[in-house]
């Protein structure tokens, strides 16, 4: 079994509480948890320079990502690490479209910015606040890989429900 965490914050944004990034904290977290892969998913922004520094320092696969406020819920969008300049430019459009913690974009806005959602891993907050609304999930469902839950109990419940998204549970850590 692979150990991954696709929900790691390294930059405090308007949607976050204040914290200061520490490469040592990130290195220790990766080592202590025995992680084989991570994604950097800050709220509504992607810092290409910092991402490149993390890739140099962390001896595992690091994917670029972003946690986007979409229709009042959160969606992890993770890229493959190719075309980083293009990914960064798209994330800058997200950053400009969501200037405050109370703002969000529509699914149509998301599709207009990222164009081909099949190129990304999409993981909405599923049984986790702010939870994706059913109408939003219906629009994204064809491209959703899994749903993020908050606990082992919710994970187990989703595993037993044939209609539920495949559950994943990440750290949602601030480094």
What are these regions (language model features)?
Residues 1-72:
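An N-terminally biased module of ancient metal coordination in phosphate/nucleic-acid-related enzymes
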Residues 33, 117-118, 162-163:
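A structural signal for short coil/turn segments at secondary-structure junctions
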Residues 47-148:
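Extended substrate/RNA-proximal surfaces in nucleic-acid metabolism proteins
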Residues 4-6, 37-43, 63-66, 122-125, ...:
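Active-site neighborhood of phospho(di)ester-bond hydrolases with catalytic His/Asp-centered motifs
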């Amino acid at each position: 079994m692979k150990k991954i965490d696709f929900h790691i914050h390294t930059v405090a944004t308007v949607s976050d509480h204040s914290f200061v990034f520490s490469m040592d904290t990130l290195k220790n977290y990766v080592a202590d948890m025995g992680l084989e892969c991570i994604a950097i998913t800050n709220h509504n922004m992607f810092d290409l320079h910092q991402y490149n520094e993390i890739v140099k320092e962390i001896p595992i696969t690091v994917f670029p990502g972003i946690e986007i406020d979409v229709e009042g819920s959160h969606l992890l969008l993770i890229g493959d690490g190719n075309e980083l300049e293009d990914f960064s430019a798209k994330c800058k459009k997200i950053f400009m479209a969501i200037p405050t913690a109370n703002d969000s974009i529509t699914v149509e806005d998301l599709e207009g910015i990222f164009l081909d959602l099949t190129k990304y891993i999409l993981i909405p907050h599923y049984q986790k606040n702010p939870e994706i609304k059913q109408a939003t999930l219906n629009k994204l469902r064809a491209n959703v890989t899994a749903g993020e839950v908050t606990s082992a109990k919710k994970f187990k419940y989703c595993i037993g429900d044939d209609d539920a998204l495949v559950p994943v549970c990440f750290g949602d850590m601030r480094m």
